[in-house]
Amino acid sequence: MIPDAIGLAQRMRRLTQWVDSRRQPPTLIRRQFRGGSLGNCYVTIDPDRQTPFAWSNLNRVYMCGAEAGMSSSSVPRMIDLFLTERVNRFFVWLSPGPDMDTARGWLEQHGLVRNRRTGYPTLCRTGHAPYRFETDLEIREVSEAEIAAASGHLGERQWSDDACSACGDGFFHYLAFDGDEPVAIAALCVFEDIGYLMAAATAESHRKRGAQQALIAKRIERAEQAGCSILVSETLYMIEHSYRNLRRAGFEEAYEKEIYEWNA
């Protein structure tokens, strides 16, 4: 059964805050608002990460609908937060919450434009149905040091950096090996009763061998052992193989995050 979208969105925002606190780069500014004119928005600011793509730009506002205390005048206050740090592009990640049409209207009124190049679905898996996937690759849980040593083999440095930098209690790292060669990476984060599947990447030369489906299966198994009652993962519609792998493993779409972009 798919959980309530608004409740899940609020929990995912807490999870994001916690993950960020464990892998925070030195340039990242984090601000959690509680009530007031910015509701319960969570804001991250990083002048060094102003890429044109929402997934790699760390200048973000995480917002769940029209939160209590917010109004149209909240949006200029958001903009000022970024301008003060000399950030010229940021994204609002709008997840389900109260009065969504009102929230959309506030953002559009102040010049934010919805990014429709792709969608950002959040998928979840409930229940305890086992999932197995056979591959000729070897899947192993590994240390952070082994992840760091393997990162150069994967060709998708940003994703492997994300996996490597999140560490400590609650994080589990996995590699797929072809003999002694690491060819794919993935991580699991356990937060409250959520098992969050994150930071997956496969070397270009070893795609279509089932590495990620096998890594999904291994993380489902580990999350069950940790007592998680729900598994969650996030992807992009344009990464069709990622979305398809999650659906095959029993994940269902819970909601889509709407991405709004602001440029100075």
Report the location of each language-model feature:
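Short amphipathic alpha-helix that is part of the acyltransferase structural core
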Residues: 1-21, 118-164
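Acyl-donor-binding surface of acyltransferase catalytic domains
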Residues: 69-143, 233, 238-239, 257-263
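N-terminal charged segments
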Residues: 1-81, 165
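Active-site rim helix/loop that mediates acceptor-substrate recognition in acyltransferases
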Residues: 16-30, 101-103, 153-177
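Conserved acetyl-CoA-binding loop-helix of GNAT-fold acetyltransferases
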Residues: 70-80, 202, 208-225, 248
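A conserved beta-strand-loop-helix scaffold within acyl/acetyltransferase catalytic domains
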Residues: 157-205
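A conserved beta-turn-beta hairpin within the catalytic core of GNAT-like acetyltransferases
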Residues: 46-61, 190-198, 207, 255
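Conserved beta-hairpin
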Residues: 31-38, 102-113, 170-184
